[in-house]
């Protein structure tokens, strides 16, 4: 073929002498023979990256209620949780899968969001149980239950049930692996930028902590206890009464 280097032409002649003429060689079209396809794996960077991630998902278990008891059954030999390559981690910085099982309260919501933010990208979230997805039985009249964890963090897979069986957890993991296998690095990066949260987050207001360590030290409590104790109660320590000591 005109324009080819001598080395390329020599390789082409050697290939035709051993296996016969190559189809498509006249127009320069690339070809893959049967022998080559049986010995060489052709893939893309996205497929290789997704295969490595779906084969070694490391979950962070965030259990707050009875759903976590069903998840604990997977750690035994009856269900063999390790066959999917899932290794539970105790640190969010080493995990790429967050499994939320149980009711999420307004007081625990900042801690949950902090754990999610500490996980490295790419990361996934599974909402396990009715209480996690919608608030469950506490969604009717509770003033502290969050009506769905997706109001705080993005959720990749919902697992309904009260509680879900261990077989349902396996089904959720398999579906998540299929989702990871079809992802692209560029698409995942764009998803993080444009759709950070699935729904509107709660409008939380920071308040002073209820437990201050000064139990029964309020002025009204001290005045009520003095007659019954018959002893002088210690004076109430305030910020104005405590004076810093001068250095000697």
From Swiss-Prot:
Location relative to the cell: Cellular thylakoid membrane
Keyword annotations: 4Fe-4S, Iron, Iron-sulfur, Membrane, Metal-binding, NAD, NADP, Plastoquinone, Quinone, Thylakoid, Translocase, Transport
Catalytic activity: a plastoquinone + NADH + (n+1) H(+)(in) = a plastoquinol + NAD(+) + n H(+)(out); a plastoquinone + NADPH + (n+1) H(+)(in) = a plastoquinol + NADP(+) + n H(+)(out)
Disulfide bonds listed in the record: none
GO cellular component: plasma membrane-derived thylakoid membrane; respiratory chain complex I
Binding site for [4Fe-4S] cluster: 66-67, 131, 162
Record-listed E.C. numbers: 7.1.1.-
Requisite cofactors: [4Fe-4S] cluster
Membrane association type: Peripheral membrane protein
MF GO annotations: 4 iron, 4 sulfur cluster binding; iron ion binding; NADH dehydrogenase (ubiquinone) activity; quinone binding
Stated role: NDH-1 shuttles electrons from an unknown electron donor, via FMN and iron-sulfur (Fe-S) centers, to quinones in the respiratory and/or the photosynthetic chain. The immediate electron acceptor for the enzyme in this species is believed to be plastoquinone. Couples the redox reaction to proton translocation, and thus conserves the redox energy in a proton gradient. Cyanobacterial NDH-1 also plays a role in inorganic carbon-concentration.
PANTHER family attached to this UniProt entry: NADH DEHYDROGENASE (PTHR11995), NADH DEHYDROGENASE [UBIQUINONE] IRON-SULFUR PROTEIN 7, MITOCHONDRIAL (PTHR11995:SF14)
Subunit structure: NDH-1 can be composed of about 15 different subunits; different subcomplexes with different compositions have been identified which probably have different functions.
Protein name per the record: NAD(P)H-quinone oxidoreductase subunit K
Source organism of the structure: Synechococcus sp. (strain WH7803)
Primary gene name: ndhK
């Amino acid at each position: 073929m005109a324009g080819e280097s001598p080395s390329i032409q020599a390789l082409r002649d050697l290939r035709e002498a051993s296996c016969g003429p190559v189809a498509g060689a006249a127009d320069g079209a690339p070809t893959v023979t049967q022998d080559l396809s049986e010995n060489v794996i052709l893939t893309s960077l996205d497929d290789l990256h997704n295969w490595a991630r779906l084969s070694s998902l490391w979950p962070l278990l965030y259990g707050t209620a009875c759903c976590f008891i069903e998840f604990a059954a997977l750690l035994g030999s009856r269900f063999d949780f390790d066959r999917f390559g899932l290794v539970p981690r105790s640190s969010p910085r080493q995990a790429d899968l967050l499994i939320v099982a149980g009711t999420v309260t307004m007081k625990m919501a900042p801690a949950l969001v902090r754990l999610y933010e500490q996980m490295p990208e790419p990361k996934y979230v599974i909402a396990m149980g009715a209480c996690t997805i919608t608030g469950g039985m506490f969604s009717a009249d509770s003033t502290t239950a969050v009506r769905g964890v997706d109001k705080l963090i993005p959720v990749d897979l919902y697992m309904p049930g009260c509680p879900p069986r261990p077989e349902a957890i396996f089904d959720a993991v398999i579906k998540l692996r299929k989702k990871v296998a079809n992802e692209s690095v560029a698409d995942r990066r764009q998803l993080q930028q444009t759709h950070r949260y699935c729904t509107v987050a709660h409008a939380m207001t920071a308040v002073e902590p209820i437990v201050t360590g000064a139990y029964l030290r309020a002025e009204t409590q001290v005045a009520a206890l003095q007659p019954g104790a018959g002893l002088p109660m210690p004076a109430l320590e305030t910020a104005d009464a405590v004076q810093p000591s001068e250095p000697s």
